[in-house]
Structure formats: C-alpha cells, structure tokens
Amino acid sequence: TIFFSYADLGFISSGLKYAAEYYIRGDRKNEIRTIGFTAFIMLSMFMLIALLFGIISIFPQILMPELEPDSENFYTARYLLILLSVSCPVIIGQRILNMIYSIRVEDYKLQRISAVGSILKILSVFFFFGSENYLLVPYFAFVQFINLSVVLMAAFQVRKYQYSFVEFLKAIRFDRIIFDKE
C-alpha cells in the first residue's frame, strides 16, 4: 500500500488545512466541498493505481518475472493483487474519515475503532497461520474485510457531526475554485 501513500500528491494535507479552516468558521458547505474535492483527487489517482494492479494481476510476471505460470505462487500473487486493487475504495474511505475526524481534533475516536480492528487482525494470525496452515490470501481478504468494517463503523459515527452522506457524494467532483486555492 506504499503506492497509495503518495498518490494524493499532497492534496490530502492541503485539503485538510482548508477544510479545517472552514470547520472553524462554521462553514459546513465549503468544508464538505473541500473534502469532496480532495476525495475526487484521491479517487482519480487511486483508481489509476487500482487499474494498474488489476492489469498486473492478470500478468503477475510483469512485477515478478520469476513466477512460473499456473504455479501456486503465481495464483497467490494474482489473488493478492486483485484484492489490493479491489480494496482501493476502502483506502479512500479511511483517508476521508481520517480528514473528517482530524478536522474536529477527534481522530482519537477513529483510532479507537481502528485499534479494535487491529486487535482482530492480530488475533486472526493464529487462525490463518500455524503448524498446518499458511493461508495468506484468505488472511489478506480478512484484513480487507476488517478494514471495510472499520470504515463502515467510523462512517456511521460521522453522522453525529450532522454530515449528510448524499451532500458529500455530490461534492465529490473537480472544483476549479478549490483547485486554484490548494
């Protein structure tokens, strides 16, 4: 997921700064507009990366030339790349929720939910990996499921901030005014 770490091109930091200013002023409309624009940039960049991973999952030898077609490692690489590609929206959700909670200086609430998810991931290692088990792909799928669950729980909690999900979805678009500002 290091590819996703820098894919926002600095727009998350900038968007966080401006959205926080709007939050402090009580300007909910422009706060959501700024977060929506930032989500649009993330969506654009992350979907390109997800598409790249999707293509590489068809031909994993592009990334790892030593893989033998139809081998167990070939299929493991393929499934892991597919799961990584499909989990892109979850990563975007994590980043957006992190912005919303950070703006309010309440990211500790998101961290609590994430901590429960992390504990479940750690405990699941004993199930997926053991003396007779080495279930890497199912483990990675489980981790992504936990990440999705954390995003859904945190998104549910965002309702306490009177965030309109529909209004936010409408704000996910390119906005020239915000682009020039950021």
Predicted feature residues:
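Interhelical loop/hinge segments that connect adjacent transmembrane helices in multipass membrane
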Residues: 136-140, 154-182
